[in-house]
């Protein structure tokens, strides 16, 4: 394909990393040219693979692309062979489409299931969406039509990095649901349970609620560190260990 001639021409005057998105059911026929051109990143479109499974052969970082309708679970069985997931947030090939907000939830779900893998997003990215994606720790966003309409390219690039923006999305479009946050009731507050809750959700805090599902407080990593230091490591104090998180939470809330 002519794209490889274009890449060779770019290589002659630029060291900009290249991400090649292959939409084919037989990507291996291009492997030799990809390796010869030392393309930094290669992304395969899941819906067009038709059962093909990538098992190596390229020196590039590998990504798997999915459309909004495809569940992220398709990444689970092939995660060892890929470095990142590319979420196509609009119809592939459609320039200027609107970002599908269902992808906010998919991003959170993927990052929880695969915390060591990167998330890339392509489609519908403007200044507003870019702001949200950055706060969701998305590694890379592909921006096209937004750069070339309604404003100079330089201004558009700056807008993609601003930290204060008017949003047309509701907080509920991208906020975490109850099932996606660490919560502990009144009967599950041992030190082990608090630590396990933080680890399960890959967050630095756990929320405490009472028997009426009302919030009582928050325990953070900092609270636990302070309590460990206060109690000389909490060694051999099983009863004290069970109460320690509550004490730490109470002190933290009083200080706030």
Q: Where would I find each of the regions flagged by the language model?
A:
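N-terminal active-site wall of soluble small-molecule enzyme domains
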Residues: 1-57
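Glycine-rich phosphate-binding active-site loops on the catalytic face of alpha/beta enzymes
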Residues: 42-51, 86-98, 136-157
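C-terminal helical cap(s) of enzyme catalytic domains, especially alpha/beta-barrels
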Residues: 55-57, 134, 148-168
